[in-house]
Curated annotation (Swiss-Prot):
Highest taxon in the source lineage: Eukaryota
Record keywords, A-Z: Carboxypeptidase, Disulfide bond, Glycoprotein, Hydrolase, Protease, Signal, Zymogen
Lineage: Eukaryota, Viridiplantae, Streptophyta, Embryophyta, Tracheophyta
Protein name, UniProt field: Serine carboxypeptidase 1
GO biological process: proteolysis; secondary metabolic process
GO MF: acyltransferase activity, transferring groups other than amino-acyl groups; serine-type carboxypeptidase activity
E.C. no: 3.4.16.5
Length: 510
């Protein structure tokens, strides 16, 4: 079947366009910066949104491997402020295997998405006042191939892992900057959440290695951000029990029994006594929404929706998760991390469908991605954003079921130490009510790097209110929490997220 995607990077049309731009210095115009971008990448309008786009948008494919036809899909949102000077940020969602349109649709993209009324009807789009494109240009990348709208003509490419994903994403960046050379002078950052706690440091490592090796084009890489990200088997695996105790989800007796039986080692149980103690922990928290313990958990359409008033949350928590988001937080929290007490381990990573079958007969709880699914599987939307049609590459899924993924990068501790040791800035943040990748583990591993504290633990504020807590270290490392937020921080606390994002990019203290 004929494909409707963009021409490959090697096409004469693109080569001529780049030559003309470089030879004659094509400048900005019309409020944007991308004058060299191929015309086939321009997004003129998006179905579901009435009115002019708030900035220039571009989308399409970059072929990272010609022989196999391995193509990664991106969506670029130019900064609404000053795209010629503002930072450029690559955004990656996790999984592994989950689409970065998760971030575009539900978190910090240019639009807020409102359901069209049924599962297949086109959603209504409204401008997002807290979009991260207010202060930066953002590239949303579906990676690796097989995720979201990215694909390969050779399905053997869907057998992949951390290191291959990082290499492909680096190839993507090098080719992308050839298409958009205007951005080479902009400060460039890599950001992501959840399993992107692996994607971000490994890709950052590839970029820095390329800079050391003199690879062209030269990327103006400055640093990276990780939100509620996985990092290390031990730190991640031991985080849940102290978190649950600190949040009053388990009693002192249960906590002390687990401590005594497991000797503080909760992730790799070796005795029946420890396993029995952890079973009591799991039983106490099993009905909560692990991605945000403040949010109701919807198990399926056949089960009546619950409210915070009849969950196991202490009454004092019931209003902590209030949000300024104009539309309701989605009812699904599946797709970006792990089941309880299942830290990242070396070797093959189970697919989300396998996790679902292994956890509950009805599938993974707290899930409903109808808005994103309806929009991204609409034929007009696919055409508008230059994505291959459903008839060609299949339906968009929030998390793919085609990957056979290997975690082969090991602990991220050494990556963080290496990158920050070379002077690259790092912002590590946690929604403090995420039980999937709890802040307790993240705070512990950032502290374990051994850097001196230069900004002692303190609250950070927005509009005169405490929005979370932060601690700054040597070598440009910052740890921060966001009060009342879950696993996908901008989804719950969009205003606070734009605040910490813009402050950190500007080099200001939170």
């Amino acid at each position: 079947m004929a494909r409707r995607g963009r021409r490959s990077l090697a096409s004469p049309a693109v080569a001529i366009a780049l030559f003309v731009f470089l030879a004659y210095g094509g400048g900005g115009g019309g409020g944007g910066v991308c004058e060299a971008a191929p015309a086939s990448a321009v997004v003129k309008s998006v179905p579901g949104f009435d009115g002019a786009l708030p900035s220039k948008h571009y989308a399409g494919y970059v072929t990272v491997e010609e022989q196999h036809g391995r193509n990664l899909f991106y969506y670029l949102v130019e900064s609404e402020r000053d795209p010629a000077k503002d930072p450029l940020v690559l955004w990656l969602n996790g999984g592994p295997g989950c689409s970065s349109f998760d971030g575009f649709v539900y978190e910090h993209g240019p639009f807020n998405f409102e359901s069209g009324g049924s599962a297949k009807s086109l959603p209504k789009l409204h401008l997002n006042p807290y979009s991260w494109s207010k202060v930066s240009s953002v590239i949303y990348l579906d990676s690796p191939a097989g995720v979201g709208l990215s694909y390969s003509k050779n399905t053997s490419d869907y057998n992949t892992g951390d290191l291959k994903t990082a290499a492909d994403s680096h190839t993507f960046l090098l080719k992308w900057f050839q298409l958009y050379p205007e951005f080479l002078s902009n400060p460039f950052y890599i950001a992501g959440e959840s399993y992107a706690g692996v994607y971000v440091p490994t890709l950052s490592h590839e970029v820095v290695k390329g800079l050391h090796d003199g690879v062209k084009p030269t990327i103006n890489f400055k640093g990276y951000m990780v939100g509620n990200g996985v990092c290390d088997t031990v730190f991640d695996g031991n985080a849940l029990v102290p978190f649950a105790h600190g949040m009053a989800l388990i009693s002192d007796d249960i906590y002390q029994e687990a401590q005594t039986a497991c000797h503080g080692n909760y992730w790799n149980t070796t005795t029946d006594k420890c396993e029995n103690a952890l079973y009591k922990v799991d039983t106490s928290i099993n009905d909560l929404n692990i991605y945000d313990i403040l949010e109701p958990c919807y198990h399926s359409k056949t089960i009546k929706k619950v409210t915070p008033a009849n969950t196991k949350l202490p009454k004092s928590f019931q209003h902590l998760g209030t949000t300024t988001k104009p539309l309701a937080v989605r009812t699904r929290m599946h797709g970006r991390a792990w089941p309880l007490r299942a830290p990242v381990r070396a070797g093959r990573v189970p697919s989300w469908q396998e996790f679902a079958r292994g956890s509950r007969p009805s599938g993974v709880p707290c899930m409903s991605d109808e808005v994103a699914t309806a929009w991204l599987n609409n034929d007009d939307v696919r055409a508008a954003i230059h994505a291959q049609p459903v008839s060609s590459i299949g339906s968009w899924l929030i998390c793919t079921n085609v990957l056979d993924f290997i975690h082969d990068a090991g602990s991220m501790i050494s990556y963080h130490k290496n990158l920050t040791g070379q002077g690259y800035r790092a912002f590590i943040y946690s929604g403090d009510h995420d039980m999937c990748v709890p802040y307790t583990g993240t705070e512990a591993w950032t502290r374990s790097l051994g850097y001196g504290v230069i900004d002692s633990w303190r609250p950070w504020h927005l509009n005169g209110q405490v929005s979370g807590y932060t601690q700054g270290y040597e070598h440009g490392l910052t740890f921060a929490t966001i009060k009342g937020a879950g696993h996908t921080v901008p989804e719950y606390k969009p205003q606070e997220s734009l605040a910490f994002y813009s402050r950190w990019l500007a080099g200001s203290k939170l």
